[in-house]
Structures are given as C-alpha cells and as structure tokens.
C-alpha cells in the first residue's frame, strides 16, 4: 500500500481521516511519502499553502502508527510455523539466510546458500517491526519421525 501525506492544501481533518483509515485497516506495512509534485499533473499546478514542517510532522505521525501496527502484526507470528521461500544470504552474516513467507513477511534463519530457491517450514521464534526470525523445522520433523519407529 502507498500512502501520500501533504497533498496540496491537505487539512488536518483530511489527514485525520487518513489516520482513521490506517487504524481501521491495520497494515502490515505501507510505503509512505510526502507529496511531491510531478510535472504535467494537475496537482503540480496547485498552489499549496501547507507548510513543509506540517507535512513532515504528519508524515512522522503516519509512519509511527504504521510501525506500531507492523510491530503488533509481526508479533502474532511468534510460535507459528510458516513456509518460507529462501532467496538471499545475509550480506552482514554469511550464516544467515532470508526469504519470504506467503504473505510477504521477511524471515531470517540460520542457513547457507544451499537453501536458495527452496521452500522450508520455519518456526518463528521472534519478531521485529518488519521481519521475523525463526528456525527451520523441516529436517527436525523428518528425523523425529524415525525416532518414534
């Protein structure tokens, strides 16, 4: 979702309507921007009397709300098992690999490049605002079945 604040002459009431909608929807994440005019568009020709500092303050309020919602929704994943398609080795830590679960959440686990392109079951152990940490359980499940025989 993309949300733009500071459209020319946006009122506080209009901005509050945006916040109300965001509270109602509860976004996992959103791309938020301060309006910038694009040449050739009707909005680029509009006179704008909303001060830049008001636009920035609104942007920060919106971002804070979306970050709170993202932190909350991410925390609900802790303890769940999700399927993750792995696609990247961490640039900072070569013992970590990352991928996405089916709803687009970024998931980090211990692993290496051999997992790239694979889908694995992962138990989510902790969360951050825009990502999840977990451990692969596919191999554990296979081996645990052999223990019960």
Region roles according to the model:
Residues 1-41, 61-72:
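Conserved C-terminal portion of the radical SAM core fold
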């Amino acid at each position: 979702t993309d949300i733009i604040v500071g459209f020319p002459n946006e009122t506080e009431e209009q901005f509050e309507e945006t916040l109300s909608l965001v509270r109602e929807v509860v976004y996992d994440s959103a791309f938020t921007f301060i309006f910038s005019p694009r040449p050739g568009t009707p909005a680029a020709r509009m006179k704008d009397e909303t001060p830049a500092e008001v636009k920035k303050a609104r942007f920060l309020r919106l971002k804070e709300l979306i970050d709170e919602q993202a932190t909350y929704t991410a925390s609900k994943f802790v303890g769940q098992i999700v399927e993750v398609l792995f696609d990247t080795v961490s640039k900072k830590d070569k013992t970590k690999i990352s991928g996405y679960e089916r709803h687009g959440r970024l998931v980090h686990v211990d692993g290496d490049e051999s997992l790239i392109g694979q889908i694995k079951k992962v138990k989510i152990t902790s969360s951050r605002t825009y990502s999840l940490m977990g451990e692969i359980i596919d191999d554990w499940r296979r081996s645990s079945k052999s223990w019960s025989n």
